[in-house]
Amino acid sequence: MHCAERLRTEERASPGLIACTAVHKPSKSTRIKPTKPHHTPSNSMESALKKDTESTCVLCCQDIDLFAVGKCDHPVCYRCSTKMRVLCEQKYCAVCREQLDKVVFLRKPEAFATLNIHHYQCEKKYDIYFGDGKVHAQFRKILLNECPHCPEPKVFSKFEELEQHMRKQHELFCCKLCLKHLKIFSYERKWYSRKDLARHRMQGDPDDTSHRGHPLCKFCDDRYLDNDELLKHLRRDHYFCHFCDADGAQEYYSDYQYLSEHFRESHYLCEEGRCSTEQFTHAFRTEIDYKAHKAAAHSKNRAEARQNRQIDIQFNYAPRQQRRNDVGGDDYEEVDRFNRQGRPGRGRGPGGQQNLRSWRYNREEEDREMAAAMRASMASHQEERSHAQERSMLKPRREEKLEPDETRNNRSTARPTNDTQARSMKSNGSLAGQDFPVLGAGAPPAPVQSMIQKPSVSLKEDDFPSLSGSVVSSPMTPAYTNQPRKHSSFQEEDFPALVSKIKPLKPQSSAASAWSQAGSKPVVAPNKPVVLPTKMTPMSSSSILSSTDPLPSASVPQPLTASSSRRKKMLTLTESHKDPPKIRCPSSSDDEDPHSGKTAQEIRTVPTMLDISTLLTVKGSSPQANPKASKKKKQTTASSLGSPSHTPETVSKMAHKENVPEKKPPETGLNKAPTAPKTNSIVNGVAEKPAEALSCTSFPENITSSKQPVTDQAPPSKEEEFPALISKKPPPGFKSAFPLRNSQSALPPPPPPGLGPAVSKPPPGFTGVPLNSNVEDSSVSAVNRPTPAIGSYLIPDHFQQRNMDLIQSIKNFLQNDETKFNEFKNYSGQFRQGALPAVQYYKSCQELLGENFNRVFNELLVLLPDTRKQQELLTAHGDFKALEKQQQGSKPKKSKKKAWQTGTSSSSSLDLDCQVCPTCKQVLALKDFNTHKTLHIGDDDFPSLQAISKIIS
């Protein structure tokens, strides 16, 4: 019977002892309380149980020879108490775990409170008191190291001496593991021969079935007491996978190399950068965690971060229900797949039910095929109709008459594309069919009637709103050199300039004949050189024709755009059949036909509708063209956009284009002046030889009071000659709206005061537009040249760490003075908020840091997260350096203002280790410039609308 059960039996049977025994609950302990015995018939049985309980140890369940009693009054045998206090060095009660400072060994159990321990013998080292000398002798005997095999007892002072004696004298050995972990007396040790010791270590003892040997660590080839000790060793000295361990797997690895292979095979292991030398932290359970780590720690740019954030997820959709009479994209795919596999015929199934199923399936397939065929037919029909419309646009209109306002508005609303394209192909006057001989060959054109006639319907000013709206809105989409061609859009290659539109309208006495006589140039004052616009970008196409009103041939001839040599040959053929003009220049080139019309050089320099619409861009507002016209205008460019070459004569001729009647200006008595020779024209980016001077001295010039001398225009820059090769520039058509940097040097001197022609009032239809404000002075335009827009701040690499290093450097230079550092932070905050100007901030920081300010200024400027504030601080630094050089007596080569307006060269001139981004104007360190430049790769191909609006504003 177990000792606890025996104690409970004694509690029920013996009224002399009140025992509360609970071995597993320390709060309820067994206490021996002396009570007065009741003399009942069962006293003899209770006394027997009492003796049995008192003679058995509750720990080792052996008979108690000597009792060990503490203040908790839980008696145990003296052997168990000695093991705990001497061998294990533990002084608590094994029953209730109460700390026992003193223990008394007695032959009979007594209450500890009744004992007078001061009269007992004592072992002060272990705080054990003995009831008499025999008890003390018995305590010392169980602690002796005595040889069990010698006939004569041999006692050794230490166990090591006994072990050596047993090995040498008796060739017996004890188990080292048992000796280390088992706290037992020397006489309880087992001694083995070599063979028995090996069996004990591997399998256990034959007489002790509870011991199954000591487990072996296969990594270290060492054995441990039991599995618990082996597990401690594995987790302390070897490696295990913390992912698999959380799932309950017990797998261990000898070193980290094998564990990393397990991470690589079963999990996700990062081996980039610093992670190749780290342990545990660079392994991840799932792919999501792995990619999140790569995006956070190893992404060098946005593209890699975006790639790392992508997760491959497969979705499995349930099959959709069969739809009836509903056709979708998947149905077309199913039809195509079904047709590729071979469509079976009807009724081929072996049985009636199979035929029924096959017939139903084919019925659905036929419905889907029918829907697909109808859709394809509608698309082809639409395409044919668009081609027919294109062909109809090639046929000239027999008559041209002015329409009422209501009819024209209705037509433009109902057919915006067709009406605009048709009106764009009209010329001033009635043109016969032979004027359009399949874009080239034909008979001489019929006489052209004058367009300056009284209209049948009175026109209102509202019919001619300003053109600036469309001009401003048109460049919102950048023009690209390689644009997809639509079926319904007309390109320049389809409609080259027709020579019939350039034929003069009037004899030499008409006011509009100056366009044809002088090569489509206004006549200037005598001996004034004229530089004509010679650049036509490749994007100038027939979209001008399709988006503007009819052009009078006498006032504004069609420009010859730089497209191909084939088109030039066509023009030569068509011009050869024209009637000779009334007045020709006798000094024309020898290569030209004397009976031909205008030369290609003259045609190329004729202003276009875009020139005239640009004339109203400066301060006026323009009419909103239809959507088709606006889209086509985005692909056009004009060499004279925004240039001051537009005169009131141009405005008066524009009135002819808009079908607005205008009175003829009176002729003046000024002497005629020969025109200046033309500059080299550029077609398709190739400079041609200039034609000979077309000035004549035999015909009178009709210079009215509404005409002004034409000012020179800047020669085409290198960027404008090849607009498709320039990336960081405004779209074609808006480059020339702003004069170039050195445009002032090419301008001729203005006429003397008083000799400039007066400006007449604007023509009818343009009264709401202040024309005088449209002609800008080139000097003003040069000053107001737009600078690249300042972009948002893009954070460089290691931004946080560099900020911390910068703060630490500033603290070190300030000698860790918190007052000065707080003052520096206050200055920085005021500068960021705009309360402190950059110059004052620069001086304040220089006063705080002294000479050390130059050491931290470069990093302070680069890490300033505001591009505009960076430029201000950079300018302040440049001003200070320039002032410092002036004080030293050295004069700078350039003015301060220009030196700081040169972008990237400014930082190098100031000995700064930084560079300014030409795109967003952010100041960058040299090591960050290449990484920052890659962020703008896509910006050149797709500029933002805000950036373009800033350019044109």
UniProtKB/Swiss-Prot annotation:
The UniProt regions of compositional bias labelled Polar residues, in chain numbering, are 410-431, 467-483, 555-564, 641-650, 695-711, 770-779
User: Which reaction equations make up its catalytic activity?
Assistant: S-ubiquitinyl-[E2 ubiquitin-conjugating enzyme]-L-cysteine + [acceptor protein]-L-lysine = [E2 ubiquitin-conjugating enzyme]-L-cysteine + N(6)-ubiquitinyl-[acceptor protein]-L-lysine
Does the keyword section mention Cell membrane? no
One GO term in the molecular function aspect is:
zinc ion binding
Q: Where is the composition biased (Low complexity)?
A: 371-380, 508-518, 536-553
Basic residues compositional bias: what residue ranges?
Answer: 25-39
Give residue ranges of zinc fingers (C2H2-type). 215-238
Which key words are in the record?
Cytoplasm, Metal-binding, Phosphoprotein, Transferase, Translation regulation, Ubl conjugation pathway, Zinc, Zinc-finger
Q: Where are the zinc fingers (RING-type)?
A: 57-97
Q: What is its EC number?
A: 2.3.2.27
In the record, Phosphoserine modifications are located at S489
Q: Spell out the subcellular localization from the entry.
A: Cytoplasm, Cytosol
Q: Where is the composition biased (Pro residues)?
A: 747-765
Q: Which GO terms describe its biological process?
A: protein K63-linked ubiquitination; protein monoubiquitination; protein ubiquitination; regulation of translation; rescue of stalled ribosome; ribosome-associated ubiquitin-dependent protein catabolic process
Annotated region Disordered: the residues are 25-47, 299-779, 884-911
State whether keyword Metal-binding applies. yes
Q: In which pathway does it act?
A: Protein modification; protein ubiquitination
Matching entries from InterPro entries are given as: RING-HC_ZNF598/Hel2, ZNF598/Hel2, Znf_C2H2_type, Znf_RING
A single cellular component GO annotation: cytosol
User: Basic and acidic residues: which segments have biased composition?
Assistant: 381-409, 655-666
Q: Tell me the function of this protein.
A: E3 ubiquitin-protein ligase that plays a key role in the ribosome quality control (RQC), a pathway that takes place when a ribosome has stalled during translation, leading to degradation of nascent peptide chains. ZNF598 is activated when ribosomes are stalled within an mRNA following translation of prematurely polyadenylated mRNAs. Acts as a ribosome collision sensor: specifically recognizes and binds collided di-ribosome, which arises when a trailing ribosome encounters a slower leading ribosome, leading to terminally arrest translation.
Q: Which family does it belong to?
A: Belongs to the ZNF598/HEL2 family.
What name appears for this protein in its UniProt entry? E3 ubiquitin-protein ligase ZNF598
Organism field = Danio rerio (Zebrafish)
